[in-house]
A protein has these predicted regions:
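Conserved class I S-adenosyl-L-methionine
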Residues: 1-55
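Class I SAM-dependent methyltransferase SAM/SAH-binding core
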Residues: 59-105
């Protein structure tokens, strides 16, 4: 099933702490405020014949939907993430179908009227060929007129220039949080950018601290994501049989006409 090298989200330690450090991250960054309600509204509007949460991670959207009466299927490339999501679902009393699969090739026994790729899930497809394969495969799993939503962001020349001169060991502090074991951890990022492949690659460094602030463990986890320009995304959607219904600049349905940290695509199977 796995076609890509091991990534940040494949590691057990990342999966078990994913919700904890994202909570800390989102409390300091406003570009994800309201993301669960956006997907709940999307599922309510388009999910009458079934919803699938692709790249579901540990279930932030999947379980939020279930808590509001929408029982979606969930899939993720990371077996570790699926395992955590399933444990959380069972703890809440939900019997959901959650399975590890590659979005470029998964097959479901049913069709869905609504597919969700939340947050950065689509951006982990590292080539146009993989993006095309995913869009075509998702289309095959959608019913006629089915809807898909996914995110990109508008590449910024200033940050691209910075990252073109950054090595994967040039770490900068990102956040501090308390891990599952109750220990303080600091996270550092080092991201470089290749303008020819449009891929951001680098490492996340996790430092675990004791009660005196002394580092007692350090873990390096790799990560890669691809930047996609709107023009190429529009062409790719046209080639793969989708029509664009809306493009938003944020989870509160801000105008998508200006440059945005979150470009949220809402597209329909033609």
């Amino acid at each position: 099933m796995r076609m890509l090298p091991q990534d940040l989200h494949d590691y057990d330690d990342v999966a078990e702490n994913y919700d904890l450090y994202l909570d800390a991250m989102y409390s300091n960054e406003d570009n994800h405020a309201g993301f669960q309600d956006f997907y709940l509204d999307f599922a309510k509007e388009y999910g009458k014949d079934g919803v699938i949460d692709i790249a579901c991670g540990t279930g932030a959207v999947l379980l939020y939907l279930a808590e509001h009466g929408i029982y979606a299927d969930g899939t993720d490339l990371s077996e570790a993430m699926c395992r955590v999501a399933e444990e959380k679902a069972k703890a809440k009393g939900f019997n959901l179908s959650i399975f590890p699969a590659n979005m470029t090739e998964f097959k479901s026994a049913r069709k869905y009227s609504c597919a969700i790729i939340a947050r950065s899930g689509f951006m982990h497809l590292l080539t146009p060929e993989l993006q095309r394969a995913a869009l075509l495969n998702i289309r095959e799993n959608l019913s006629d007129g089915g809807m898909l939503t996914f995110n990109t962001f508008d590449p910024h020349p200033f940050f691209q220039a910075q990252q073109m001169n950054t090595k994967d060991t040039d770490y900068s502090f990102r956040l501090e949080y308390t891990n599952k074991q109750g220990q303080r951890e600091k996270i550092y990022n080092a991201i470089s950018y290749n303008p020819y492949t449009q891929i951001m690659s680098g490492n996340w460094k996790f430092e675990t601290l004791d009660d005196n602030g002394v580092i007692i463990e350090e873990r390096i986890r790799p990560v890669k994501m691809r930047q996609t320009y709107r023009q190429e995304m529009k062409y790719l959607l046209e080639m793969t049989g989708y029509e664009i219904v809306n493009i938003y600049g944020g989870y509160h349905k801000e105008s998508g006409e200006c440059s945005a940290k979150n470009v949220i695509w809402c597209v329909r199977k033609k």
